[in-house]
Amino acid sequence: RWQASFGLEERTAEKTPVRQRIVVSARLLGFGYQRLVPSFAGMRFEMGNDGWHSFLALNDESASVDASFDFTPVWNSMPAGASFCVAVPYSHGIAEEMLSHISQENDKLNGALDGGAGLCWYEDSKLQTPLFVGQFDGTAEQAQLPGKLFTQNIGAHESKAPEGVLPVSQTQQGEAQIWRREVSSRYGQYPKAQAAQPDQLMSDYFFRVSLAMQNKTLLFSLDDTLVNNALQALNKTRPAMVDVIPTDGIVPLYINPQGMAKLLRNETLTSLPKNLEPVFYNAAQTLLMPKLDALSQQPRYVMKLAQMEPGAAWQWLPITWQPL
């Protein structure tokens, strides 16, 4: 029966009655990315006599032999003020296998990517430019590989540039090594005039894509400002998300409705210029903006788990939604 396929027992009269139950597998929630978080099995929402309750399911230990659920390094690196954040456990071998399609040196990364990883979106940035934080625990030789992969694979074809791509700038900032490349894009954050070599860009806008590594922390974003802010958070010169996130329990999710509403509002208005898309612009103003205004009035929340250790398959863990 379907209950057994989700690790659930048959309902009986003796058990606490469940009026409604929604169970979603990670195969659906992952949108094809579930292989990146093999420890995640699914989510469940139940309505009983005392209201709604939610649960998160883990796969068995074989799906994530060396996954880490310690997300403290992620929250230490993320600058405060995020609109939405998610942290996930990393399992060895997943990223290395993916990198094998773009680099012959992926085998040298084995065991170097470690711990948890996280993504955060910020209201003053863009929807397509979140900040990624990961953990790198490799040798001195392996520490050179992220920069090589960045140089080989990050960029756009710039036919006006002598080498067909704009150069990568590599700088040292304190203990951090930083790689940056300007990349043409019609959706870029900066106008062409602000580029180091504007005559070589193929678009009127560009991203200043950045990768940084400081000690064991990897930072990446299409928005260079977010990487700079994260370095400041690491160096204790800017507040970090760890100052906001509760320290008791495991926190894989942070939601700031006010920041989310502002980010979505900015993205909507940017993609629907009033003079070019008057019909959709008016529809957004009438139907979407009131809902975003209502969203912005909601409190901030974190998803909190008391413990998170893979055991048997479909291990259901109760979720606490804690307001901040």
Features from the language model and the residues they span:
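Single conserved position on a long alpha-helix in the C-terminal lobe of the eukaryotic protein kinase
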Residues: R1-A4, G115-P246
